[in-house]
Each structure stands twice: as C-alpha cells, then as structure tokens.
Amino acid sequence: MYILDTNVILELRKAGKTHQNVRKWAERLPSASLYISVISVLELEIGILLIDRRDKEQGAILRAWMDRHVLPTFSGRVLAIDTAVAQRCATLHVPNPRSDRDALIAATALVHGLTVATRNVADFERTGVAVLNPWEA
C-alpha cells in the first residue's frame, strides 16, 4: 500500500500526458491501496489559492479538479496527523532537521506501514521509510 506524495497526485492529473511509467504503475494498483496525507491536501490547496490569485480561470479549473476528483477519489483514505504521527515525525528531525512537510508524510507512512510513492526520493532518505519512484517503476 502506498501514500502518494503531492508530485504523484499532480502527475496523475495530466490526462493524456501522464508519464507512461507513472500511469502504468497506478493502473496496476487497486485504488483502495492508495492513500494521501493531509499534508498533500494542504500543498494542493496552497497551490490552487496561489494560482487563483493570478488566474481566476485556471484557479477555477484546479478547484473543480480538487473538489470533484481528488477529494472524492481519496474519500476515507486521507491520512491525518495524529499523536503517533507527530511523535514519529519529531524523531525524524533529530539529529538532522528536515522539511516539516516531508517529515510528516514520512512519519505518516511509517506509522501506517505504507510506502511513499514520490519522484523526490532524496527528500525521504534517512527516514527509514520505504520509497518507490513511479517514474522509474
């Protein structure tokens, strides 16, 4: 089972233009085996709001994608940050501090026994989490 990093969610949005390895990888998996972190929801929401400020039309398209596709697709499979995740995340910052968002995604994966699917493998090095790069799968 996998937790999708934000870059994988965005790649899967590219209808007809999704990298073939990512598309084939995702098609082989049952949707019930794919999860996202509330951190990815945060990152997507920030991106939508920033784009909407400069391009209302594109902002509306992204808002519709988020509300009609991402959230319904992952309904019941958006993993929250709870006490166990927060405590595990803290251990990932010592002795080497890292990005809070990446550490929270890694901690969520560790607590729930998931593999992180990401293009940014280096962001998750030395966390102890299993990582898969779907672009190379």
Regions from the PLM with identified roles:
Residues 1-39, 50-67, 137:
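Short, well-structured N-terminal submotif of metal-dependent ribonuclease cores
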Residues 1, 106, 110-137:
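Acidic, PIN/NYN-like endoribonuclease modules and their adjacent C-terminal/linker elements
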Residues 5, 43, 102, 120-123:
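Acidic active-site catalytic centers that drive phospho-/nucleotidyl reactions
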Residues 46-51, 72-119:
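Active-site neighborhoods of divalent-metal-dependent phosphate/nucleic-acid chemistry enzymes
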Residues 9, 41-44, 86, 124:
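A generic structural signal for short hydrophobic patches within well-formed alpha-helices
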Residues 38-39, 82, 120, 135:
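Residues at the C-termini of beta-strands that transition into short coil/loop
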Residues 11-13, 47, 88-89, 127, ...:
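Residues that scaffold the ATP/ADP-binding catalytic core of kinase and kinase-like folds
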Residues 29-32, 73, 112, 127:
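Structured helix-beta-strand junction loops
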